Amino acid sequence: MSITYMNMFMAFTISLLGLLMYRSHMMSSLLCLEGMMLSLFVMMTMAILNTHLTLASMIPIILLVFAACEAALGLSLLVMVSTTYGMDYVQNLNLLQC
């Protein structure tokens, strides 16, 4: 395993740990999710380029499309929650009450 793969795997792991540990605010959770998606994109792109899979070259772009949709939905949810409740604490939200 090369040093670049190890760095990207470490970035994914740190983002996952950040998502699990610092989940009090919705904005920090969204930033950790974006870090995970970015590291997955880089790892997938490097793997496809190293193995010369030309048919799978669209997969990282599709992943970026899903990441952009996830970011847009997350930010719209953040705006809705912060205007409705006046805070972005994830712990105080209960979606079953809506």
Curated annotation (Swiss-Prot):
It is a multi-pass membrane protein. Pfam families: Oxidored_q2. GO terms for molecular function: NADH dehydrogenase (ubiquinone) activity. One of its GO terms (biological process) is ATP synthesis coupled electron transport. It is found in: Mitochondrion inner membrane. Its EC number is 7.1.1.2. Keywords: Electron transport, Membrane, Mitochondrion, Mitochondrion inner membrane, NAD, Respiratory chain, Translocase, Transmembrane, Transmembrane helix, Transport, Ubiquinone. It catalyses: a ubiquinone + NADH + 5 H(+)(in) = a ubiquinol + NAD(+) + 4 H(+)(out). The chain crosses the membrane at residues 1-21, 29-49, 61-81. One of its GO terms (cellular component) is mitochondrial inner membrane. It comes from the Eukaryota. Core subunit of the mitochondrial membrane respiratory chain NADH dehydrogenase (Complex I) which catalyzes electron transfer from NADH through the respiratory chain, using ubiquinone as an electron acceptor. Part of the enzyme membrane arm which is embedded in the lipid bilayer and involved in proton translocation. Belongs to the complex I subunit 4L family. Core subunit of respiratory chain NADH dehydrogenase (Complex I) which is composed of 45 different subunits. This is NADH-ubiquinone oxidoreductase chain 4L.
